[in-house]
Structures are given as structure tokens and as C-alpha cells.
Amino acid sequence: MARLSGVDLPREKRVEIALTYIFGIGRSRSRDTLAATGVNPDTRVRDLTDDEVQKLREWIDANYRVEGDLNREIKQDIRRKMEIGCYQGLRHRRNLPVHGQRTHTNARTRKGPRRAIAGKKKAGKK
């Protein structure tokens, strides 16, 4: 089993697909990486040579921020926006959608479950 950037790649999948298991690498970055290193995208992970795995590892480490480094950078960016008080930071702080989505009826994932609000009490019969 090949291990790149702290992620075990699935042995039975094509390399092009297996690379997408690494956080920060999608299909297009996977294709770019394989083209730059000269590895055939149709090769199965189990058939990769140690030399090819080493080439992939070096290319990814040199050119992309992935996994823990990328997660840390994203969290720092969000924290910075919250500290400077920009609109996106305020939305993050209030746990509301950040990218302009409506909140009147939707946004349940971000806002969480509905909170019950006490309704009007019915007037009793006299």
C-alpha cells in the first residue's frame, strides 16, 4: 500500500483516482501531478514502483499544500477574518452561511436544529 502525505492510498484503484484521497488534491491536480512526474494515470496503485511513489511524494511535497498544512492554513484564514471583523468573519462567528445564501427559510445545516419558541397561550373559556 502506497503512503503519500500521511494517507494510505487504496491499492485497487487507478493512481489518478487514488491521489484524490489526499485532502487538497482533486481530479485536476491529480492529473497535473501524474503528467509532471511521468506516471501513467491508468496504473493501479498496487503496480506502482517504489521509484514512482518516491517521485509522486517529492512532487506533491514540493508543489502543493495538502492534509494537515492545508487544514491549518484554512483555519488560520477563518480565525484572521473573525479577528479583523470583516463581514465573512462576522458570519463565521455567528455560525451563519458565509457566501451569501439566504437564511430566512434555509441554512439548517449551519444554524443547527430549530429552537422551539413559546407560542401565544390560548384564551381560556369563561
Curated annotation (Swiss-Prot):
One Pfam family linked to the record: Ribosomal_S13
Database matches in InterPro entries: Rbsml_uS13_C (IPR027437), Ribosomal_uS13 (IPR001892), Ribosomal_uS13-like_H2TH (IPR010979), Ribosomal_uS13_bac-type (IPR019980), Ribosomal_uS13_CS (IPR018269)
Keywords: Ribonucleoprotein, Ribosomal protein, RNA-binding, rRNA-binding, tRNA-binding
GO BP term, example: translation
Described purpose of this protein according to its UniProt entry: Located at the top of the head of the 30S subunit, it contacts several helices of the 16S rRNA. In the 70S ribosome it contacts the 23S rRNA (bridge B1a) and protein L5 of the 50S subunit (bridge B1b), connecting the 2 subunits; these bridges are implicated in subunit movement. Contacts the tRNAs in the A and P-sites.
Subunit structure: Part of the 30S ribosomal subunit. Forms a loose heterodimer with protein S19. Forms two bridges to the 50S subunit in the 70S ribosome.
Protein name: Small ribosomal subunit protein uS13
Organism: Parafrankia sp. (strain EAN1pec)
Lineage: Bacteria, Bacillati, Actinomycetota, Actinomycetes, Frankiales
